[in-house]
């Protein structure tokens, strides 16, 4: 009865260190960890202890006897990561454990290490967690929205509630007595980098990649065009996108790009609104989706099936919940790739693609069509989008799709931060292992650090940020221990005074807990995990009704 890792795996790696027989791979010290689509349990080596189940922050692990029907393909996926062995073979238990990355040890100085973290998504919260393992370290997290947790709150599809459970880990971090939230505070607007550094030994930026990579073709930008990430933010009640004018009065939507976000959008646009009503989806978005006329979403990729950007777990999940089809031409492309590709993961994707329904078969369900070798040329329409024209990649042929909504899903892009260097081409802050590097001098900027997507680019999954943040924290601690970080010039109590003077509507940890509790209470009456606020004013009103946070002295 081995345990199985399923679709919602976040690559956090906590399960690896909980396993007493080192049967979960790749481990964080192995080369494939940073790029692996998920982690895998060796069914032959697993001793059925279940330690990994409680360690997983997103509930992605279950016994093979307790899997839902849609999770059964993950039995083979886990097993196929390992060499083929006789079915009755059982490896003897081993005492070898995955090597744990030791926490950086902070040396005692006159002033305890105090770090400002800008951003509150996974990279930020993993960094805070790592810092707070050391006695005496203080962490202040600054976030421009009144609510924390970045893309976990506003970028994960609402029907992926298991994955959103990682916020329970972040909540525990935020409850630490040496942790403070300064929410609804924008660095670069309310406070500068230098002002943060005057109150902290170090400033760690974990702001993600908030912009979209843009597709520069004629017609993008007219009504009826947008980006998949904007649509996901709209669906998730992000206050900046809560009332996006999304027109779903036409029968077809085209999504350009075929990564996981593209699949999320396609799945949500074709989902039964009654099912979405049991999630934390935005009320406004749910109303619009309830009146949708969309019958088909075309997910168009420039390259062939073997180069599909989506992950295998997401493809399997999509097939289990949605009507996914291929036309005859794309099916031939799948067959051609399968004959030439040797990589086992890619071959598994191609196997799943080859099993999809033929698009010529009639269906009463809304459907998702995966299309390949289509290079976008222009959006059709004058006053608003009426379709999109593609060239068939590598040929002189053109292909058109009528569509009332055209979305691009070609990736995220980091954004310049005032007072810090920025690599425009890579869209990251130049750094060496997390230390921000001034390109003009070729040396690190004292006290400035980065983690997450703004450090390495928009790659990996939620848990990938954990190892990335640990590396940066080790750099912070090493520099502090070496005496390279200047003690704050301001007294600790002055920080809160300065923040509230600049932004009277600052939301602290107590205010966030009040917002969180109110959303959960509103949702519980409707059988939902929460009903999110969409207006900042409503969030601030709830937070203002919370008792003030009693500040603790640094010690």
UniProtKB/Swiss-Prot annotation:
FAD binds at residues 123, 143, 151, 187, 453, 460-462. [4Fe-4S] cluster 1 binds at residues 9, 15, 19. It holds the Pfam family Pyr_redox_2. [4Fe-4S] cluster 2 binds at residues 46, 49, 52, 56. Keywords: 4Fe-4S, Electron transport, FAD, Flavoprotein, Iron, Iron-sulfur, Metal-binding, NADP, Oxidoreductase, Repeat, Transport. Residues 2-29, 37-66 form the 4Fe-4S ferredoxin-type domain. It catalyses: 2 reduced [2Fe-2S]-[ferredoxin] + NADP(+) + H(+) = 2 oxidized [2Fe-2S]-[ferredoxin] + NADPH. This is Probable ferredoxin/ferredoxin--NADP reductase. It comes from Mycobacterium leprae (strain TN). The gene is fprB.
């Amino acid at each position: 009865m081995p345990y199985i890792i399923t679709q919602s795996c976040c690559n956090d790696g906590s399960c690896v260190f909980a396993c007493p027989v080192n049967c979960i791979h790749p481990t964080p010290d192995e080369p494939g960890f940073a790029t692996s689509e998920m982690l895998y349990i060796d069914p032959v080596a697993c001793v059925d202890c279940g330690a990994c189940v409680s360690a997983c922050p997103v509930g992605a692990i279950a016994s093979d006897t307790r899997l839902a029907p849609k999770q059964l393909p993950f039995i083979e996926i886990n097993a196929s990561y390992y060499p083929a062995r006789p079915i009755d073979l059982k490896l003897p238990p081993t005492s070898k454990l995955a090597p744990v990355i030791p926490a950086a040890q902070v040396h005692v100085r006159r002033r305890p290490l105090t770090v400002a973290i800008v951003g509150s998504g996974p990279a930020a919260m993993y960094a805070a967690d790592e810092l707070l393992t050391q006695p005496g370290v203080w962490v202040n997290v600054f976030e421009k929205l009144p609510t924390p947790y970045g893309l976990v709150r506003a970028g994960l599809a609402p029907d992926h509630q298991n994955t959103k459970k990682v916020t329970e880990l972040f909540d525990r971090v935020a409850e630490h007595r040496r942790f403070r939230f300064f929410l609804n505070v924008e660095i670069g607007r309310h406070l500068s980098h230098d002002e943060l550094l005057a109150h902290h030994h170090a400033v760690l930026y974990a702001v993600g990649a908030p912009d979209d990579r843009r597709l520069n073709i004629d017609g993008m930008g007219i009504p009826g065009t947008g980006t998949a990430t904007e649509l996901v933010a709209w669906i998730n009640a992000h206050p900046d996108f809560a009332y996006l004018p999304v027109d779903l009065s036409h029968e077809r939507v085209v999504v350009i790009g075929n990564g996981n976000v593209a699949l999320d959008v396609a799945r949500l646009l074709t989902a039964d609104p009654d099912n979405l009503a049991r999630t934390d989806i935005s009320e406004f978005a749910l109303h619009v989706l309830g009146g949708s006329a969309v019958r088909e979403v075309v997910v168009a990729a420039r390259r062939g099936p073997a180069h599909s950007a989506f992950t295998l777990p997401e493809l399997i999940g999509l097939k289990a919940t949605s009507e996914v089809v291929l036309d005859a031409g794309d099916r031939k492309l799948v067959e051609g790739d399968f004959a030439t590709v040797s990589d086992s993961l890619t071959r598994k994707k191609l196997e799943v693609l080859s099993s999809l329904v033929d698009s010529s078969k009639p269906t009463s369900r809304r459907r998702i069509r995966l299309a390949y070798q289509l290079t976008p040329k222009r959006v059709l329409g004058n006053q608003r989008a009426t379709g999109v024209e593609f060239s068939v990649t590598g040929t002189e042929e053109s292909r058109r799709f009528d569509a009332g909504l055209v979305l691009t899903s070609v990736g995220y892009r980091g954004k310049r931060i005032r007072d810090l260097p920025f690599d425009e081409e890579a869209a990251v802050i130049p750094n060496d292992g997390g230390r921000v590097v001034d390109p003009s001098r070729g040396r690190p900027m004292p006290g400035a650090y980065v983690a997450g997507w703004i450090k390495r680019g928009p790659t990996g999954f939620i848990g990938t940020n954990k190892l990335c943040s640990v590396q940066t924290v080790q750099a912070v601690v090493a520099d502090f221990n070496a005496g390279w970080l200047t003690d704050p010039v301001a007294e600790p109590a002055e920080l809160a005074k300065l923040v509230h003077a600049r932004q009277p509507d600052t939301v602290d940890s107590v205010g966030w807990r009040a917002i969180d509790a109110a959303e959960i209470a509103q949702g519980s009456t409707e059988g939902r995990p929460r009903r999110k606020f969409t207006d900042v004013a409503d969030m601030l009103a709830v937070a203002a009704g919370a008792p003030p946070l009693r500040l603790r002295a640094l010690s």
